[in-house]
Curated annotation (Swiss-Prot):
BP term (GO), one: coenzyme A biosynthetic process
One term of GO molecular function: pantothenate kinase activity
UniProt keyword annotations, A-Z: ATP-binding, Coenzyme A biosynthesis, Cytoplasm, Kinase, Metal-binding, Nucleotide-binding, Potassium, Transferase
Catalytic activity: (R)-pantothenate + ATP = (R)-4'-phosphopantothenate + ADP + H(+)
Cofactor(s) recorded in Swiss-Prot or TrEMBL: NH4(+); K(+)
Pfam family, one: Pan_kinase
InterPro entries with a match to the protein in the record: ATPase_NBD, Type_III_PanK
Organism: Cytophaga hutchinsonii (strain ATCC 33406 / DSM 1761 / CIP 103989 / NBRC 15051 / NCIMB 9469 / D465)
Residues noted as binding ATP in the record, renumbered to the chain: 6-13, 114
Family: Belongs to the type III pantothenate kinase family.
Gene Ontology terms: cellular component: cytoplasm
Name of the featured protein: Type III pantothenate kinase
Gene symbol of the encoding locus: coaX
Pathway connected to this protein: Cofactor biosynthesis; coenzyme A biosynthesis; CoA from (R)-pantothenate: step 1/5
Length: 235
């Protein structure tokens, strides 16, 4: 069994793979709980994509082989990016996940987490880059933090088109703004690359999956699938 770990800014998601198939996933907020869960499984390999220091996972090295996704890791895709040393491992994992699920295709993927990112990987499995902008909670918090009177608002699945209150106007601006941002990118890529798959992942993907006009694939485990593919490519 392989276990892959995707450490984000707020949560840690782990997935167990056996025979190339995803068996289960779990999400944690505390690193201690992750270490306990992995140690209990006794996997053959552990592969980690993390925004934290590698020493945080040193306890796992006593029970199994631990590998980290970094700039030295061999990848099953090519990277066409001017600053590859700054490319986030989460974006690499998502790109590999897209190419694994839809090989030989143009794939446009959006990760709706702390940040809203998009990436594009072409039919030749070349990741060409994408964009980074504030995510849902970051936009709400920025409006409350950088103004005197605007309240902190929580996301709802059905924001109004026309806000009839300050909270409603914020809801409309943030959620409709993100929707139109995503749809704008989709249209621009469709005009240049046909056909193209559109994938959504990340904790806030559920807020938008039914609101986008174009057919999309919502794949919560996209990064985990990519990490397992990279692990198998290296061991």
């Amino acid at each position: 069994m392989n276990i892959v770990i995707d450490v984000g800014n707020n949560y840690i998601k782990i997935g167990a793979f056996s025979g190339g198939k995803l068996q289960w996933t779990k999400t944690y907020s505390r690193l201690h709980d992750v270490l306990q869960a992995v140690q209990a499984e006794k996997p053959v390999h552990v592969f980690i994509s993390s925004v934290r220091n590698q020493t945080d996972f040193s306890a796992l090295e006593t029970v199994t082989q631990v590998h980290f996704l970094n700039k030295h890791t061999r990848l099953p895709i090519d990277i066409d990016y001017e600053t590859p040393h700054t490319l986030g491992t989460d974006r690499i994992a998502a790109a590999v996940g897209a190419a694994t699920l839809f090989p030989g295709c143009n794939n446009l993927f959006f990760d709706l987490g702390t940040c809203l990112t998009h990436g594009f990987i072409n039919t030749k499995a070349v990741f060409e880059g994408g964009s980074i902008s504030p995510g849902v909670e970051m936009r709400f918090k920025a409006l409350a933090h950088f103004t005197e009177k605007l309240p902190l608002v929580k996301a709802e699945k059905e924001p109004p088109l026309t806000g009839k209150s300050t909270s409603g106007s914020i809801m409309s601006g943030v959620l409709n703004g993100i929707q139109f941002e995503i749809e704008g990118f989709i249209e621009a890529y469709q005009n240049k690359y046909t056909p193209i798959n559109v994938l959504l992942t990340g904790g806030n993907a559920s807020l938008f999956e039914k609101r986008l006009k174009e057919p999309i694939f919502v794949i919560a485990e996209l990064n985990l699938i990519g990490l397992n593919r990279i692990l198998n490519y290296n061991v």
